[in-house]
Amino acid sequence: MKDIGQQLYTTHLNGGHNSLTMSPKQPDANGAPRPNRQEAQTLLYQGSEAEAAMMTIATCAKCKSVHKISLQDLQKGTGKDGMYVCFQCSLGAAPPNFHFVSNNSSATHVGNKTENFSSSVNSKFKVRNFKPGKYYCDKCRFSTKDPLQYKKHTLQHEEIKFICSHCSYISYTKGEFQRHLVKHTGIFPYQCEYCDYGAIRNDYIVKHTKRVHERAGAKRPVKAVAKLEPKRTGTSKQNPELLKASNPRTTFQNKWSDQLSGFSLHANKDKMHNIMLLPEPKEYQKDVVCIPNKMTLSEPNEVNLFENKNVEVEVLSPAKEPVQPGMPLTVVAPAELVVPANCLAQLIDVKVVNGTQQLVLKLFPLEENNCLEAGRDNGGNSERMVKEKGSNEQEKVLSAEKTKSLTVDGNVGKLVGIDSFQPSVQKQLKNVKWVRSYDFIMPNSSVHNNGKSFINSETIEDFQKKNNLYPHRTAFPSVALKGHSLASVFKNSVLRSLGAASNPFPYKAAVCFAESGRNLHSSSQQLLPFAASPATCSFSGEKGLLPVSENDLESTSKVNIPVKVVSSNRKQEDNQTEEHKAVSTVGQISSQHKSEYLHINITGEDRSQQPGDKPLELKNSERTNNTNDGPVISSVFSLSSGSENVPEGIKWNSSTSKIKSIELLRRKIAQLIESCGKPSSLASNSAHRRSVGQASKGTSKATSEGIQEINVSLTGLGHSTGTLQKPPNDGGITGNRQLTHQQIYPHFADGSNRKTKSRVARKAHVATPVLIPKGAVLRVLNSSENAHIIEATCEAPVSIPCSERQLIKPVPFCPVRQADSDLQPLRSERGPIDMSPNIETPLRPKLRKESAVCSTIHRKTGLLYGQQGSSELNKQGRLLSRSLSISRNKTKQVHLSRKKNKIQAEPSRCLKDPSIFQVARQLRLIAAKPDQLIKCPRRNQPVIVLNHPDVDSPEVTNVMKVINKYKGNVLKVVLSERTRCQLGIRRHHVRLTYQNAEEASQIKRQMMLKMKLKKVHKNNYQVVDSLPDDSSQCVFKCWFCGRLYEDQEEWMSHGQRHLIEATRDWDVLSSKGK
């Protein structure tokens, strides 16, 4: 029958006669397979041309059966509409259902008689919606009305065939051939990366992923397993037994967490490495490769440090069946069990020793793109070997009790005690370079529902011993964290953030420090710059050690806080003489994530930061559990161009923090405003910002040489940051994180001036008179009343982002000596406050340099007694001014100050009512939908500024009025500098203002249009419509989205856009209907 069918179709093609309807696709029941090689076209029909000219194929219009008939019979058998009707249907009897499908596969044609041709075609190619007049291919789903196209298509099938090598089945399409091969091999050509689902087409995998593995529109696997799929050919050739479990994954589960924390264990053919455990949440961490300079452990005593070790684990899955080789395991393991994130662990064998199950695991490093290029020293030529024992295979033995409590035995790379590292080990470890670094960030705010810390603080204190910890040359970055609410500890110097399952992790996490022989005081703070690559890290805790990198990759979407690490290329000869010592400022800042993160200011190792770097900020976020209150804004645009200005989301999230003293805060802000316009206070402010951080034992008697040394280094540095060496005896850092004046200056002069004198000529144009050291303490003396220091009562201390284009990099030194018990600095426990100048774009571009002066004005502190301290302050200010090389900056500073004073004068009048300071809200934008796109507006695109109800305050009203005065030069709309200074608003992320008690009751005015701007230039906006004067006028509500407008025209134009969008395709529909 197959030959007959081919003859019939070929007859039609060669005969050139077009039948009225071709047969529907009904491929062979006998099923011809197909191979993956091309063959020459074969002419299967060997009849005469005369017969081909006389015979053709026709399809019955009623029963859809295919018949081979002559042209004469075709002309006779056509019905009323020119359709061919077969003999049985023409009799008027009820046609049988598909009577052409005959069980007899040997139907033949004798002579010129026409018989029912049962095209034994595969049922998968049956045409569901058969339409007369179309040609249907019986080998695939192709159909066309053009007979020439149909002829070309059928010829392609004769040329391209796929023959199965197992059974000689002939297929004509690749998809059918792959479907057939699954019967023989059992392996699908496409695999789901999150589960064992396989398919013959990739679009099936895409649909499966969307249907099964996506939650709330965000693509993430059900199990947070970072899957690194190995090459299937490599594993099957090297280890045939691995095919028993093609997707082995072992997840170490935390039974206190809601989700599994995935550690992918995959197979490969490469040789074995013994690398520390790197937990890898898929969405937030990147692969890390440690590349030593081809050094191995050579001495016998070094090898003894890394010994086999039994680790007891609890098997969770499989629970009801015995553990067998090749099956996936889910175990709860302590921190001692280390499996690299870029390695695969395959269960090879199960042994029983003394009634205990021992599972033999085989480790394979993956061959995929985990091996990045080595650092500058290696040039990408070094091998991926970390503490390798020299054997091609290393085995880990999991031994379990009869109660499913397993232990792991193997070359785990155990570090036998924190103080057991000998200098020989350190010499080997110091050459390890990091070519890539993790992003440690808590994945989602919704995960931190318990509000607890990862690891108990008791566990942390066990590892924070006052021993010689070596945090500098370990194979992994080390972090020591301490604090009552501390959450994060590095297991083997890697934060065990457990991916999405970031609930408290009760197991022990040994913090292994292996470098730099430096004493770690439990209450003192030290910073580790070690050889790390660009990283943006966020850690839990208030104090600690952080890696430092050459570049500051500030991610605006996921990474909360940029932690920049300064890495060095030069080798350290001696552990005790390293200059990776810096003094950092620690502050608690309300960050945008609902877990606690750590930001540290670091300078290190006589290495200036790159021009693009920013000083680091140490921040500690507040935990907020209420993420749903506040209106949802469907479209919010940033009012300045650039990728860093893209808003995080479009939903306001408010976390309320009470201010202890409303009146004192109001007076403090008023004093800051008053001092903005005094030119004489500018120099004293700059000098005082330095002297505050250096004041010791109740006086601020900084010598002129010291001040000049600082100013020279700061002025010459430009964007670079000088290093601050630490005395060898660690005397500079005390329990309260205070530095004496005598310890700072000599090392400061040595550490920074020698590196920056060469930069003075190139970077001099960057320096400005606004020199504010990173971390200077804000102390405002309420001069009208008693002389006690006002404590910063807001939970978020002052932290102002810095703009490198307008301001030079200040050196982050600043811990201040607490001398008088009556003077309350800002939370000694939290450390001094970050006071880097905030250069946001004010109303005129030239005013950008002045904004920091108006925002962070330091009044004389209680450390300076009366007029004597004030005069000393002025002396220091004069010395500071002399040290600045560019004299014209001073006159420009005074000129800009007067302009700024005029602009700030009007907003300052709105601070009479203390009720507006009752509640400070932290406003953050969150996307209402996971797939919502937020982007900056394009040029000439009208921008509508929508404000949260809490922003509807006299403060914002006056700011808008001031902006309206400068219609041609609006760079962006922000709150006033003093508000950002006092409440620590992070640029581009948080909107923070005061809520008036009266406006809080007006809930119906949740979404109020404040101003409409038009983008007239790349960085400029023009005010199209100003603020309505009468706030009590009628409010119009949008019918579509519920947005409220005070202006009727705006409300109408807004609704018109909705109407246009809703009826965009109506004209197409109406034309089709006609």
UniProtKB/Swiss-Prot annotation:
Gene3D superfamilies hit by this protein: Classic Zinc Finger
Main localization, broad class: nucleus
Region (Disordered): 12-36, 568-590, 603-632, 678-704
Biased segments, Basic and acidic residues type: 570-582, 604-622
A single cellular component GO annotation: nucleus
Zn finger (C2H2-type) location: 162-184, 190-213, 1036-1058
Originating organism: Homo sapiens
Domain of life: Eukaryota
Keyword set, alphabetical order: Chromatin regulator, DNA-binding, Isopeptide bond, Metal-binding, Nucleus, Repeat, Transcription, Transcription regulation, Ubl conjugation, Zinc, Zinc-finger
Subcellular locations according to the entry: Nucleus
Main function: Through its association with the EHMT1-EHMT2/G9A and PRC2/EED-EZH2 histone methyltransferase complexes may function in gene silencing, regulating repressive post-translational methylation of histone tails at promoters of target genes.
Cross-link (Glycyl lysine isopeptide (Lys-Gly) (interchain with G-Cter in SUMO2)): K482, K491, K558, K594, K809, K846, K860
Biased composition (Polar residues): 12-24, 693-704
Similarity-based family: Belongs to the krueppel C2H2-type zinc-finger protein family.
Protein name (record): Zinc finger protein 518B
GO molecular function: DNA binding; DNA-binding transcription factor activity, RNA polymerase II-specific; zinc ion binding
GO BP of this protein: chromatin organization; regulation of transcription by RNA polymerase II
SMART domains per the UniProt record, alphabetical: ZnF_C2H2
